[in-house]
Design a protein with these regions (language model features):
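Active-site hotspot residues in diverse enzymes, especially metal/ion-binding acidic/histidine motifs
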Residues: 1-354
Length: 354
């Protein structure tokens, strides 16, 4: 690909990352502070830059970098991969432009993530899919994962950090509430994108649901069965069936909200998911499960209590930690660290204590 084409692609990508139309980009460039050398640009010129018809001048790229809050170097590095084949889940309709924004943001973040791992000499862990022939295979895979990752039978303290420690890249993104999660395999590496704004219990479940999409070969199943198996996988990794049954018993007529709260605090799984699991394992009857849902949908106070989040929030700082580790080991400069963090020199310098 010639340079003007990928520069154009990166300009378009930067605009999409911000969620701007060409009109919005034009207006922002036109209203830049007077202290910044301003190059007047028409909407038509911007369109030609994005399509690779014309190569922008150095001053123009400086202006674009300013409004996008990106280093000029961003425009000269073509993306090494795409997320065109990513599978995503959403609760309701989400705009195509928002989905594209999420994909491009993820691409840009992953480029920086892979780069710092390469600098630190960290080998990538390629994904090996497991063929699922029946529901039993989902239980077995979840059990094997817990064993392979040395999780024991206790709750997972931080799902995102645990996944990243085992080679899965997890990207949190600020987006609309209709977006649940997305998963992809990039150069053999598992990538998961989740909604940053969700409650901890929902983020944990969604991340593991997406991991199910990555680890399980479910090509022979329809969408409904695929989603069911990924939900089962997430539930089993969070709280294994044997542990769940040992705590609740084989058969129950009722389960108290107090008991649900206790398990929720230990395993970081929502009360709704716990009740569903109790029904799935035949601990409660279908009648009691229906009653629970009817009460929740008709009693606002009960619904609020059931859906209340009580688990600590979680995220991962692995990428940031690797950058500062490389900086303190003299593997990179402060300016390179700022680039890899998509930050500025002052922020990087302020975080260097010794």
């Amino acid at each position: 690909m010639c340079s003007n084409q990928y520069i154009g692609q990166k300009i378009r990508a930067a605009r999409k990352m911000r969620g701007w139309s060409l009109d919005e980009l034009h207006d922002r460039l036109a209203n830049m502070p007077a202290i910044i050398p301003h190059v007047p640009l028409s909407k038509q010129s911007l369109s030609k830059y994005e399509r690779g018809v014309v190569i922008p001048s150095g001053d123009t790229l400086q202006n674009l970098a300013y409004v996008f809050k990106l280093p000029v170097l961003f425009f000269f590095k073509p993306f090494k991969f795409t997320l065109d084949d990513a599978e995503y889940r959403k609760t309701t309709k989400m705009s195509k432009s928002e989905l594209e924004r999420i994909k491009i943001l993820t691409q840009e973040r992953l480029e920086r993530y892979f780069t710092i791992e390469e600098i630190c000499g960290i080998a990538q862990q390629n994904i090996v899919k497991t063929i699922v022939k029946e529901e039993k295979d989902v239980y077995l895979l979840a059990k094997k994962l817990r064993e392979d990752w040395n999780l024991g039978l206790d709750g997972i303290v931080n799902v995102i950090e645990t996944m990243e420690a085992h080679g899965i890249k997890v990207i949190e993104t600020d987006t609309v509430s209709t977006f649940d999660g997305m998963s992809a395999t990039v150069n053999g590496i598992g990538v998961i994108i989740i909604n940053k704004g969700f409650a901890p219990e929902r983020k944990r479940f969604t991340a593991l649901h997406e991991l199910g999409h990555i680890l399980m070969d479910l090509n022979e199943y329809n969408h409904e069965t695929t989603e069911k198996y990924c939900n089962l996988f997430a539930s089993e990794v969070l709280l294994p069936r044997d542990v769940f049954i040992s705590m609740f018993g084989q058969k129950r007529h009722d389960i108290s909200l107090y008991e649900l709260r206790y398990l929720q605090s230990l395993y970081g799984i929502s009360a709704d998911a716990l009740i569903y699991k109790a029904r799935k394992e035949n601990i409660i009857s279908i009648q009691r499960y229906k009653y629970f849902n009817i009460k929740k949908n008709s009693d606002a106070l009960f619904k609020a209590e059931v859906e209340k989040s009580i688990f600590q929030n979680e995220t991962s700082f692995r990428q940031e930690n690797l950058v500062f580790k490389a900086l303190n080991s003299d593997l990179i400069s402060c300016s390179r660290a700022a680039e890899l963090l998509s930050s500025d020199l002052k922020t990087v310098s302020d975080n260097i204590l010794v």
